[in-house]
Regions:
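Internal, Lys/Arg-enriched amphipathic helical interaction segments that engage polyanionic partners
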Residues: 1-42
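A structural signal for well-ordered alpha-helices, especially hydrophobic packing surfaces
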Residues: 13-23, 51, 70, 116, ...
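Charged, terminal alpha-helix-loop-beta segments
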Residues: 42-46, 61, 86
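Short, hydrophobic, well-ordered secondary-structure elements
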Residues: 47-48, 52-75
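Short, charged amphipathic alpha-helical segments flanked by flexible coils
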Residues: 75-104
């Protein structure tokens, strides 16, 4: 029986060693990124279907939810502190102030944030279909450029 226990302990140590190697090599991080990309790809696909059906207000909320998560991940990848209470504007300003991306990108993200805020707070006349379509395409490009 002790031999079996020693064998299990050895197998456990081998598994832990393997996990440590994967962590050190960044492989588990890459798997997490793949899962996140798949989930948010689904969200962006849903937004695209909403846009095609004329439901651009909820599409704006979905697209910017993906964008906000992407900004959090970008902050994390660049060792910038992020609080749970940080909103899209705070994340955007932090990234731009640290020169992670340009002021032009910051202004674009500010515009997308304003569109989302109008959608989220019932200012529907301020939400234009063409702005949400452009935001959807812009966020796709942003994700490919910054997190791809």
């Amino acid at each position: 029986m002790q031999q079996d226990s020693a064998s299990y302990a050895g197998q456990g140590a081998t598994i832990l060693e393997s996990i440590g190697t994967d962590l050190a090599g960044g492989y588990l991080r890459k798997v997490e990124d793949l899962v996140v990309a798949d989930v948010f790809g689904d969200f962006l696909d849903m937004a695209e279907h909403l846009l095609a059906a004329g439901y651009f207000v909820p599409a704006a909320a979905l697209v910017c939810a993906v964008l906000e998560d992407a900004l959090r991940r970008l902050c994390s990848r660049n060792a910038l502190m992020v609080a749970n209470t940080d909103d899209l504007a705070a994340l955007n300003n932090r990234l731009a102030s640290k020169k992670i991306y340009s002021n032009i990108v910051r202004k674009q993200v500010d515009f997308w944030s304003a569109v989302r805020n109008a959608a989220d707070h019932g200012r529907f006349p301020d939400v234009k279909s063409e702005d949400v379509h452009a935001m959807h395409q812009g966020v796709l490009a942003f994700l490919a450029d910054r997190l791809g």
